[in-house]
Amino acid sequence: ALMTAIIVVLQVVASFVKFGPFTITLALAPILIGAALYGPKAGACLGGVFGAVVLLACILGWDPGGAILWNANPFLTALVCLGKGILAGLAAGLVYRAIAWGGKSHSSGRMLGGSIAAGIVSPVVNTGLFLLGLFFLFPTYLEAWATGAGQTVITYMIFTMVSINFVLELLINLVLSTVIVRVVSARSHS
């Protein structure tokens, strides 16, 4: 319940913080902590909460691009928002479990490796599925945004949509990996 509340608060706040034309995802860190503490299913559930808040931002117009997609096709917008969140949380949990618990021992080094790997995989899955969703489900909107920016679709996706947000999300997750290890370590010792 605590992780759910943290995710809701962080993502609502993030809905109003923009780096370039898009909002940054701040909720991946608590998803990673939940996935590390409670496993891949918990990561998927927490990712679903994150996706629901992102969808709410689209519906309420907090995310202007998301609002355009919602008005164009609510079902596909919900599919992208919820799907990318759920799968990012699931992937983080699976990667953490495979690395941190992959051997017979659950050492702090394995936990750190698992946290770092999960911290990389989660934003890659989140951003990757978002881009694939736009490319395959909303190509006319993606083309219009790219044309409006004077870019090709691929250039727009890489340099406008991914560059700033993805790098910031990745750095935040990597920095917080050490915090995640401490939380998991403290819990396993109690």
Whereabouts are the PLM-identified features?
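Loop-helix junctions at membrane interfaces
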Residues: 1-190
